[in-house]
Each structure stands twice: as C-alpha cells, then as structure tokens.
Amino acid sequence: MSSETVSYFSHPFPRRQSVGVSVGGVIVGGSAPVVVQSMTNTDTADVDSTVAQVVALHRAGSEIVRITVDRDESAAAVPKIRERLERLGHDVPLVGDFHYIGHKLLADHPACAEALAKYRINPGNVGFKDKKDKQFADIVEMAIRYDKPVRIGVNWGSLDQELLTTLMDRNQAEGAPLSAQDVMREAIVQSALISANLAEEIGLGRDKIILSAKVSQVQDLIAVYTMLAQRSNHALHLGLTEAGMGTKGIVASSAAMGILLQQGIGDTIRISLTPEPGGDRTREVQVAQELLQTMGFRQFVPIVAACPGCGRTTSTVFQELAQTIQEDIRRNMPLWREKYPGVEALSVAVMGCIVNGPGESKHADIGISLPGTGETPSAPVFVDGKKVATLRGPGIAEDFQKMVADYIENRFGLGRKIAS
C-alpha cells in the first residue's frame, strides 16, 4: 500500500484549505469543523411559527438556520424573529434566502438587513439581462454596508441561461465537443466563480463569501464540487438539492457528501430532505450530524451501537431498549451538553445475543448483552471493558437505563471534576 493511500485513509482526513467566513460568530471554513445548517419551511411572515421551528432546529443541533425572505411582510418579520429568539436564549445565526427581489427588500427593510447574519444570493435569478449585474451589485453593497457575508448559491434548476447558452454554443464550435452534461457542470461552476469574482471587484472580501453549487444527481454534485475545490479557495456549502423523501433523500445526500467530505471538500452541509406530511423538520439536522459523526469528523451525541438482529434474537427487547436509549439521549442532549461536558464521546452498546454481544459490549463505554433465543434469561453489563453486573427479570431495560444515567453522572458530572 502506498504512503498516499495510507494518508488518504488516515484520521483526521486531509482538509481542503479554504478561507474562513464568520456567520454570526459561527466560523465556516478555514480550520473550523464542518458546520451543520438547516432551513425552515414556514411562512417567515408568521413570526410565531417561524420562531418555533428555528428553536426546534437549533435545539436539534443546527448551527445556522436559513429562512425565506420573499416579500415585504417576510422582511419586516425578520427583526421580530431575531428579537424573539434572543429572548428565548437561541442566538443562532439566521440566513436570509433571497430570490428575484432581494436587492429591493434589503434596501427597503434596513432592520432586516441588520438582523440577518448572512445573505444568500442566487446568480440565476438575481436579475436578468442588463439588470442582472446591477441588482447583484446592490445586494453585495448591502452586505458591505452591514458587514455581512453572502452565500453565492448556484442551483441547476435556476442556472443563468445566458451563460449556459454561451458555453453550449462555444462547445459546439469545438472539434471534439463535450457532452451536454459536462457543459452544464462547467456552467454551474463558472456561474459561481464569475459571481464571486464580481463580488470581490465590488469590494466584498473573500472572507465574506461562501459558494454553493447544488444539483440533484449524486455524480453531478461530486463533479461540480471537485471542480470548484480545484479552482477556488472559497468556503464551500455542500448540499444536494431536491434530494427527495425518506430513505432515498438520506442515501443520496450521504453518498454524495460522504465522498466529498472524505476528499476534504466541504465546510458546511445541509441535508435537504422532503419531510413526510406532518413529519419532523429536525430530521435533516439529525441526518447531517450522523453523517459527520459516522465519518469521524465531529461528535454530537453519544453513539448507541445495536446488532441488526437475526434468528437468534426473536425477542424485540434489545431493539426496544436500543431505541429507548437513543431517544433518551437525543432528548437530553441540550441539557447534557451544558451539564456533562464531553458526553458526546460516550458509546453505548445494546446487543441481542451471546455470539457478538459480550465482545461488542466490552468495546463500548457501557454495554449490555441481552439473552437471545434459548439463552439463559440474564444480561451481563460491561463498563469500560469489564463486567460489572448481570441483570435479570422483567426490569432489565429500566435497570440498564439507570446504569447509563449513573455512568454519565460519574464520568462527566460535576462530582467527578471535584473528586479529581
């Protein structure tokens, strides 16, 4: 195995060097960890609903939240949303998502321009023909005036058609023309880079610019961001647009972003999931955290390992216990982060039979091996690799939950610090 291969799989992974950008105090790029962000789907003019969803997203772990600013009523609501969030103790940076009339909204609502931590600009619809550069410049000048960063967010569904047509015509004149897909990828990259260069010419510093180039296909996303990473040192926002619902959206986003992150590309991510009707918007935050944690980039919540089950595990007790422990951890993490510093590194194992159960449980900080089919109805518990107890009877689940809570208190709690 070559030294280059060893380096590629080492930890930490080699990270592309980008220019760091402060978004309301959250650093994106540079040497900062990859940041998790999300977006509301409420009507921003509805202050109560928007505040409630931002709070839920922030509690779930979103470090930046984007909101739609599409009309006067939405822009007027932004300062109220910001004020309400601060009163509730949620000082999460808000990003204004602007399309078509962002230049006008920012000019007409200075309190909105001030309250937002970042402006998102789409070069494909900021203006058309002779108005495009002027309206783009207006937003950039607002960012300079209020000392705000911008994300220049190209999207293949609203790609600058003039640029695409120019590149298509130029490609046809070549002796060996590229495919239409390759030309589209190049147009997306050029749209982002041309816009970034224009913003810098107007006077916006590179430490105020984040780029994104979103498409809906995995291979396109990998190609486009690889090209951007090679041709720029701007901070990059990763995201697969129109990823879809449920498992499909999770798999597509994880496949694309996992490859890019492994290559050191990406400074902030958003998993754009289509929620089920009545579904939980915070799911996208959880998936983003799990992607980064699974790849070893960050730690957000304790890991609960559980076996998949087989013919030896006809009982559902281990599945129910694993789910209960995971839900309990998620529910308590906002408090635990404050009360138990370092608890994110905890690992818990809930196993279903004797084959791998004891071994897996020993590798976790605290683990339990529940009895499988035909096995003695007892469950050994391991703490820091050593067997410390054997649980029996109908209260195994409740007893183990208490042991987990006691372990967290003893290892991460204030009493441990005083004793040390």
UniProtKB/Swiss-Prot annotation:
This is 4-hydroxy-3-methylbut-2-en-1-yl diphosphate synthase (flavodoxin). SUPFAM superfamilies: Nitrite and sulphite reductase 4Fe-4S domain-like. It is an enzyme of class 1 (oxidoreductase). It comes from Brucella suis (strain ATCC 23445 / NCTC 10510). Gene3D superfamilies: Dihydropteroate synthase-like (3.20.20.20), Sulfite Reductase Hemoprotein, domain 1 (3.30.413.10). Converts 2C-methyl-D-erythritol 2,4-cyclodiphosphate (ME-2,4cPP) into 1-hydroxy-2-methyl-2-(E)-butenyl 4-diphosphate. [4Fe-4S] cluster binds at C307, C310, C353, E360. Keywords: 4Fe-4S, Iron, Iron-sulfur, Isoprene biosynthesis, Metal-binding, Oxidoreductase. The keyword Iron applies. Pathway: Isoprenoid biosynthesis; isopentenyl diphosphate biosynthesis via DXP pathway; isopentenyl diphosphate from 1-deoxy-D-xylulose 5-phosphate: step 5/6. InterPro entries: Dihydropteroate_synth-like_sf, IspG_bac, IspG_bac-typ, NO2/SO3_Rdtase_4Fe4S_sf. Its cofactor is [4Fe-4S] cluster. GO terms for biological process: isopentenyl diphosphate biosynthetic process, methylerythritol 4-phosphate pathway; terpenoid biosynthetic process. The gene is ispG. One of its GO terms (molecular function) is 4 iron, 4 sulfur cluster binding. It catalyses: (2E)-4-hydroxy-3-methylbut-2-enyl diphosphate + oxidized [flavodoxin] + H2O + 2 H(+) = 2-C-methyl-D-erythritol 2,4-cyclic diphosphate + reduced [flavodoxin]. Its EC number is 1.17.7.3. Binds 1 [4Fe-4S] cluster. It comes from the Bacteria. Belongs to the IspG family.
